[in-house]
């Protein structure tokens, strides 16, 4: 995949145009693991190119599970805001059909994570500190690096580019990224904020 911006990248990244896969469906792919259509493949490619142009893929010093990542807020504050609003208005109501007691409190963070043979190739097993977590495959021209949930015996191998894989963040769904074998993998990680009473 080229990292040179395409002509429509600015419209997609800054204006959130042609970004949304508006198909409304929620599919259970494992115990308490759901897939929801989210972005178009064109939006995924535009976000990859924008992240590469920013060029700030680095682990956060205080992160106990550091990854080579760049926040959407760093790429574009308006992109972060559009994603936060889209998830709250379009995706969260679908999630409430399976988890009726969840409250939307915005995003803790949303970031692009990169796996490459010359840097980070995998991520150790862990669970997140969020209300709900999600992941989007931004590309599929690589081998390995599946997001794996050992307790549920589920991976994201068959989740389409642009779809959101969603799960409860704490305790029950430890996950890891398996070793990358070839290519470069880009993913989008979403951490939904915990309700205030739990912070």
For the regions a protein language model found, what residue spans apply to each?
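Non-heme Fe(II)/2-oxoglutarate
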Residues: 6, 10-104
